[in-house]
Amino acid sequence: MINITIPTPDVTITKKVNPQESNIYGFTEFHLITRELGGIFMFYNDKDELLYVGKARKLRPRIKKHFEDAVSPIRMHRDEVTKIEVCIVEDPVHREIYETYIINEGKAKYNEDKVFFKQA
């Protein structure tokens, strides 16, 4: 049995109650997410259910793209995202392992790739 410890998030940002404070689906603190470093990110809803897990070589641009892109797997569910957690993981192999592991252990609702559990 492989034992993987999920990293503690380096940054957590939450949707603001007053959406006019932000032009990106209620999130105002994207500046707290590194622009230059790689890692993994998790999107959660207001019940703290895992919605989506992703990885990136440059975190902030990739996360923002999910809220702007017409082909993002969460494009129809952006309003559900109330919390974003970010873990800095510079090694690309480690990012790949963590992403796949978290998708399956957390049963991420909107991930389509790397899914090895049966969706309900």
Q: Which residue stretches match the model-derived regions?
A:
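GIY-YIG nuclease catalytic motif and its immediate N-terminal context
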Residues: 1-57, 96-97
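Structure-specific nucleic-acid interaction/processing domains
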Residues: 36-38, 60-68, 82-120
